[in-house]
């Protein structure tokens, strides 16, 4: 199947998209470097070891004030349209197309492969052609249990999501806000079936 034919999982409404902008999970209302230092302490408290970041600014801040993420998801732009240059592009690099307000089928598969590479000792970068925000969902769903996912909100919060079952279930609930036809596409995605969906 070519990239142009990959099904898209489209959030149904403004309300559904707005839910992803809420500071749920562990929200840190601080600017860097303070926000990163707090996240670091929480990582230690939760005994997390894998850092996954979603977003260019968060990825740069974590690398600057802590250490390089094991997995980062970036689109080389900020919300204001500023181009971000990442000098450390070594390691495994994936590219995926993901249009605004969508989740591509391919993003789940690439995220799973990315974590497999991380567990093999590689640093991984996923470069998104489009918008990376919603890839926080597969970043949580596909993450090993010792992972912490970090992403930023335009309201200024840094959000930390430990990859535990409770937060994975929350992400699955967000996915129920997809249109019916899109939910059928989602049901047929192997990565989501692994979390308990049954094909009908």
Swiss-Prot record:
Keywords: Coenzyme A biosynthesis, GTP-binding, Kinase, Nucleotide-binding, Transferase. Its EC number is 2.7.1.237. InterPro entries: GTP-dep_dephospho-CoA_kin (IPR007164). Signal peptide: none annotated. It catalyses: 3'-dephospho-CoA + GTP = GDP + CoA + H(+). GTP binds at residues 56-58, 75, 132. Pathway: Cofactor biosynthesis; coenzyme A biosynthesis. It is an enzyme of class 2 (transferase). One of its GO terms (biological process) is coenzyme A biosynthetic process. Pfam families: DUF359. HAMAP family: Dephospho_CoA_kinase_GTP_dep (MF_00590). Catalyzes the GTP-dependent phosphorylation of the 3'-hydroxyl group of dephosphocoenzyme A to form coenzyme A (CoA). This is GTP-dependent dephospho-CoA kinase.
């Amino acid at each position: 199947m070519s990239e142009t034919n990959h099904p898209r999982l489209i959030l149904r409404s403004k309300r559904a998209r707005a839910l992803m902008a809420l500071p749920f999970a562990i929200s840190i209302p601080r600017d860097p470097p303070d926000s990163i230092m707090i996240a670091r302490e929480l990582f230690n408290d939760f005994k997390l070891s894998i850092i996954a970041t979603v977003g260019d600014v968060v990825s740069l801040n974590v690398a600057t004030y802590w250490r390089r993420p094991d997995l980062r998801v970036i689109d080389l732009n900020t919300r204001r349209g500023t181009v971000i240059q990442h000098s450390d592009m070594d390691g495994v690099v994936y590219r995926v197309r993901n249009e605004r307000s969508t989740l591509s089928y391919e993003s789940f598969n690439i995220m799973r492969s990315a974590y497999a590479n991380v567990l093999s000792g590689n640093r991984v970068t996923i470069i998104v052609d489009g918008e990376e925000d919603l890839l926080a969902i597969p970043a949580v769903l596909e993450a090993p249990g010792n992972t912490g996912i970090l992403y930023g909100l335009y309201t200024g919060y840094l959000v930390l999501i430990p990859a535990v079952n409770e937060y994975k279930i929350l992400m699955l609930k967000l996915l129920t806000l997809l249109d019916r036809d899109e939910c059928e596409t989602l049901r047929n995605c192997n990565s989501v079936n692994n979390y308990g969906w049954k094909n009908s």
